[in-house]
């Protein structure tokens, strides 16, 4: 039995017998289930302030293909400086997120400093890479002083446990065993995340959930990290029934440029 099949079986049993929060949730404002009245194809019609979800021309996520990128060596490795800081875990009903209380460090893009604010998790992944959708995606949301946003995305496939999520497992379990939607997680270190910035994609897009705000700088890591089936199961158990698979469908690229950086190597080592 594959790990993916096992995950689905465990998830079904957990929803039937132990997901107490699913029994008491009222209908959500939006759903990830295609075909539902409040599903992804209808997000733009649910509220006037969500109109961009249906009419925006630079929406995320998108399909990333190596044969449709513009190579740009001037991008360079990410200039990031993260630090351990107090954080809380929040269950929005649609996803589990890490919300940093203090200064968790920053990322610099085009000489603009973006502070790390929170980390969202989506399963399966929202972005696809060369036709493949992965088991999990972590999205690190950053904001600048003038309210510009930048998201760093890490794609995961099943394998060894992710060290960052390993530190949070006991807290995530509490969401599926109680009515809590916010838990203090103590000091959380974003450096535990498996970020390999030797190769990545860069494009302009949007947030992937309503109100689907555009003008977001996306950086998607080329190297895929690993996460255990158990860790993904815990994230799925925590959310509402209509967000178990909380990945927005792929959006049209609409002739946007997707840039690609890869650190060059020579016989003497990395250039």
UniProtKB/Swiss-Prot annotation:
Activity control mechanisms: The carbonate dehydratase activity is not substantially changed by the addition of Zn(2+).
Keywords noted in UniProt: Allergen, Antioxidant, Disulfide bond, Lyase, Oxidoreductase, Signal, Storage protein
Tissue specificity as recorded in UniProt: Expressed in tuber (at protein level).
InterPro entries referenced in this protein's UniProt entry, alphabetically: Alpha_CA_prokaryot-like (IPR041891), CA_dom (IPR001148), CA_dom_sf (IPR036398), Carbonic_anhydrase_a-class (IPR023561)
Pfam families from the UniProt entry: Carb_anhydrase
CDD domains hit by this protein: alpha_CA_prokaryotic_like
Subunit structure: Monomer. Homodimer.
Designated name of the protein: Dioscorin dioA3
Organism of origin: Dioscorea japonica
Gene assigned in the entry: dioA3
């Amino acid at each position: 039995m594959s790990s993916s099949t096992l995950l689905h079986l465990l998830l079904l049993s957990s929803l039937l017998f132990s997901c107490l929060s699913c029994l008491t949730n009222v209908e959500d404002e939006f759903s990830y289930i295609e075909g539902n009245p409040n599903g992804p194809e209808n997000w733009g019609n649910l509220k006037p302030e969500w109109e961009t979800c249906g009419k925006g021309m630079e929406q995320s996520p998108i399909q990333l293909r190596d044969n449709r990128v513009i190579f740009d060596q001037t991008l360079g490795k990410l200039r990031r400086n993260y630090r351990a800081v107090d954080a809380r875990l929040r269950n929005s009903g649609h996803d589990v997120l890490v919300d940093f209380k203090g200064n968790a460090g920053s990322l610099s893009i085009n000489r603009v400093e973006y502070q790390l604010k929170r980390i969202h998790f989506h399963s399966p992944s929202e972005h696809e890479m060369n036709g493949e959708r992965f088991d999990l995606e972590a999205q690190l949301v950053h904001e600048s002083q003038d309210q510009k946003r930048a998201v760093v995305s890490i794609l995961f496939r099943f394998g060894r446990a992710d060290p960052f999520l390993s530190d949070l497992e006991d807290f995530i379990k509490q969401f599926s065993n109680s009515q809590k939607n916010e838990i203090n997680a103590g000091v959380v270190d974003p450096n535990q995340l498996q970020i390999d910035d030797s190769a990545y994609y860069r494009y302009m897009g949007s947030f992937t959930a309503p109100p689907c705000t555009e003008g977001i700088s996306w950086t998607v890591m080329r190297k895929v990290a690993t996460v255990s089936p158990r860790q993904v199961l815990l994230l799925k158990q925590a959310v509402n029934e209509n967000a178990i698979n909380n990945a927005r469908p792929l959006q049209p690229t609409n002739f946007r440029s997707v840039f690609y950086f890869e650190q060059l190597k020579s016989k003497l080592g990395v250039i």
